[in-house]
Amino acid sequence: MAKKVINVVKLQIPAGAATPAPPVGPALGQAGINIVGFTKDFNARTADQKGMIIPVVITVYEDRSFEFITKTPPAAVLLKKAAKVDKGSGEPNTKKVAKVTKDQVKEIAETKMKDLNAADIEAAMRMIEGTARSMGFTVED
């Protein structure tokens, strides 16, 4: 018989840098998760992605055990890294802050493909281009 799920917690945590301090500790404590166990597992699993924000979905079961799935970094984080900027534009329609190439967009789309709801790489690229435009980035050929 399958374990009964009592809670699902979604967080975005810097890779390899999960600590019991807020915001991670309180969110996990409320769910009844062993915080130290989670932070050790998460940091070990994401040690190779230092500097990235990693979305994680934690499933908590009735017996207080848990399992978690790490996802790919958000498209906005990957775009900012590719364009070498700290943040997007506050007014994306009027102020463009950076440029990204189609090759960079394709690379990001390939990275994100398993988490995107896209049938093929072209559809994924269109999604990433839309995110780039909404951040005030110009997509060039």
Curated annotation (Swiss-Prot):
The entry's keywords: Methylation, Ribonucleoprotein, Ribosomal protein, RNA-binding, rRNA-binding
PROSITE patterns given in the database record: RIBOSOMAL_L11
Keyword Lipoprotein: no
PTM comment, free text: One or more lysine residues are methylated.
GO cellular component, one term: cytosolic large ribosomal subunit
Transmembrane spans: none
Gene Ontology biological process terms in this record: translation
Stored Pfam families: Ribosomal_L11 (PF00298), Ribosomal_L11_N (PF03946)
Signal sequence coordinates: none
Listed GO MF terms: large ribosomal subunit rRNA binding; structural constituent of ribosome
Protein family according to the UniProt entry: Belongs to the universal ribosomal protein uL11 family.
Assembly: Part of the ribosomal stalk of the 50S ribosomal subunit. Interacts with L10 and the large rRNA to form the base of the stalk. L10 forms an elongated spine to which L12 dimers bind in a sequential fashion forming a multimeric L10(L12)X complex.
Function: Forms part of the ribosomal stalk which helps the ribosome interact with GTP-bound translation factors.
Name this polypeptide is given: Large ribosomal subunit protein uL11
Natural source organism: Lactobacillus johnsonii (strain CNCM I-12250 / La1 / NCC 533)
